[in-house]
């Protein structure tokens, strides 16, 4: 896993350059958002169960066919696997959020996920929708707590959504 600082330093080290104004600006942005990153991670940590419960309830309300015979969440085992996966998305996005870098999402979530889901005939659209719901629920909570830095939340969630939505992975 890389954080934003390591990514910047590695990029400049590979080219043998000192940090320029662009690098310093990126570092300043990361450090200035640090307190908000911690607050958002605390919200996710403290409310993970409720966030997961609300996201799954909304998903199954919107797409009840997932719970019917033949649906990908039909049977207790499949339902539990779906909830487990939604929890993984939430947990790993919280790590990426703190790190200010989506590298961990590529390493631990995306590499092989799409192929695995396709081989098991797990539809990607409900997966993408569950990630969107997680993002929306967290953003609503940020509004309630007067935290305005939604971009911090959007970056890791949108990274997952965009990667899983691509046609040519």
Curated annotation (Swiss-Prot):
Domain of life, per UniProt, equals: Eukaryota
Tell me if Transferase is a UniProt keyword of this record.
no
Instruction: Please tell me where (2R,3E)-phycocyanobilin binds in this chain.
Output: 82
Entries under CDD domains matching the protein: APC_beta (cd12126)
Q: What main location does UniProt list?
A: plastid
Q: Where in the cell is it found?
A: Plastid, Chloroplast thylakoid membrane
Pfam families reported in the protein's UniProt record: Phycobilisome
* Cysteine disulfide partners in this protein: none
Post-translational modification comment from the UniProt entry: Contains one covalently linked bilin chromophore.
What GO cellular component is one of the record's annotations? phycobilisome
N4-methylasparagine occurs at: 72
Instruction: Enumerate the InterPro entries for this protein.
Output: Allophycocyanin_b, Globin-like_sf, Phycobilisome_asu/bsu, Phycobilisome_asu/bsu_sf
Q: How does it sit in the membrane?
A: Peripheral membrane protein
Q: Which UniProt keywords apply?
A: Antenna complex, Bile pigment, Chloroplast, Chromophore, Electron transport, Membrane, Methylation, Photosynthesis, Phycobilisome, Plastid, Thylakoid, Transport
Which Gene Ontology BP annotations are present?
photosynthesis
Q: Which SUPFAM superfamilies match?
A: Globin-like
Family, per entry: Belongs to the phycobiliprotein family.
Q: Its biological function?
A: Light-harvesting photosynthetic bile pigment-protein from the phycobiliprotein complex. Allophycocyanin has a maximum absorption at approximately 650 nanometers.
- Subunit and partners: Heterodimer of an alpha and a beta chain.
The protein, known as:
Allophycocyanin subunit beta-18
Source organism (scientific name) = Porphyra purpurea
The top of its lineage is: Eukaryota, Rhodophyta, Bangiophyceae, Bangiales, Bangiaceae
UniProt gene name: apcF
